[in-house]
Amino acid sequence: MRGLLALSLAACAAAAPAVSHESIHGDAAPILSSSNAEVVPNSYIIKFKKHVTDDKISDHHTWIQKIHSSRMDLKKRSQMPMVDDVFRGLKHTYKIGQDFMGYSGHFDEDTIEAVRRHPDVEYIERDSIVHTMSVSEDVDSEGKCDSDIEKSAPWGLARISHRDTLSFATFNKYLYAAEGGEGVDAYVIDTGTNVEHVDFEGRAKWGKTIPNGDADVDGNGHGTHCSGTIAGKKYGVAKKASVYAVKVLRSNGSGTMADVVAGVEWAAKSHLEQVKAAKDGKRKGFKGSVANMSLGGGKTQALDDTVNAAVSVGIHFAVAAGNDNADACNYSPAAAAKAVTVGASAIDDSRAYFSNYGKCTDIFAPGLSILSTWIGSKYATNTISGTSMASPHICGLLAYYLSLQPSSDSEYSLATISPEKMKANLLKIATVGALSDMPRDTPNLLAWNGGGCSNYSAIVDAGSYKATPKAQSDKISSVSELEKAIEHDYEVISGKVVKGVSSLSDKAEKLSEKIHDMVEEELKEFLEEIAH
């Protein structure tokens, strides 16, 4: 929990100051900033010295506004047409007796430098974000805080919201922040999305169809499944995110690399358009964009470079590690260094038997027997497996964490969190050492959503969590048989469902009924056993 910030000039001389001083030129006033706070860019609080009279304060306000206006006119005539949105000038004036007189506002560096040299100014402090001190936002490494709870949730959602191996009490309970995903666009670069599905609540839209002559419809189901895991009301990690279908693969689950590259390019350009719209005030509440690509093949520099370029323009990108039980560095886009490359885990916290591994795999997420949205009707669901199913968990998590940031049009907005920083934080807070059957040089990191807490800074500050190893039970044969029965009908190769498509609808319904009838009884026996 953040401590109360108590600042005094005398305290600045302490051994480990909470406030840092920037260099002082001559008699210029110091600029203070808290070392443990989130700074609001270009926003400052200025305190006058005690001897300053009301008349001098009034003159100072007139003086600072003239300087500010002059600086803004100069910038507008040069190359900064939108400076008014960043540097708003005088915002508040303060007078609490004679002990605290001052003002706050948004100013550029040259203006602040002039303020520093004014003889009536005691100090300048960088504005920063403050938070409520509610106990519910006190996040420890286990993520204990108040949260919304989705009951009867898919096991994958439950797993990323709990630190320890799932138990009978947690296997179907997803802890989450209700606003997760709000203001975030998710580009699903795949076979398309069943945008009419009820689980999307109207938040799914058709973005672009790349293959020539193909229809604006998901004829495969793979992309719809991924979209549901990212943003579905019941099946999704980030339940308020908007989904944009970017179709690069045809109904048979295959496509050309040229089309895939074009799809990534379209998503990147669309993202930049939304960024501009937010800056121009045409879109309120925009938080950023994420993308998921649960496809791939052999190593290709073009695809890796394309994904890295999309990340460089601001898209937070998740990609599947691949399903060949091999080194992910030999596959693309799994080898794209700037994306988050995702391996698959099973319900017993083992690495899924098909999942690729190695140093190019950044993190793991649930990918075996994942229930999500499907095609055929607006209510259809399906259970399939693959790193294709793991990657959307991470894409949804990126959207979830992005939504906990201030919107780009907010006056309290921080500098936009970069994909590089978000990736680093995602890995920093992951559960460490939870997975078994992990080859050498493979990060043993399992994704975590903060346990439903909505204070992103507190989640990051809490850091990682070392999992407690549990002995594997021998009494899981019935669960294993159920998983094998599901997987037998859906053969997953390089992230694509390529077998049994014609019979999926009837068999999926039967399997879904079988799962609902059996899962509580089977998992109760299994999970109670491994808990001891």
Q: Where are the regions a protein language model picked out?
A:
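Active-site-proximal beta-strand/loop segments in catalytic clefts of secreted hydrolases
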Residues: 48-50, 107-108, 125-130, 163, ...
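Acidic-leg catalytic submotif of subtilisin-like serine proteases
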Residues: 122-125, 153-214, 291
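Autoinhibitory propeptides
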Residues: 21-39, 77-156
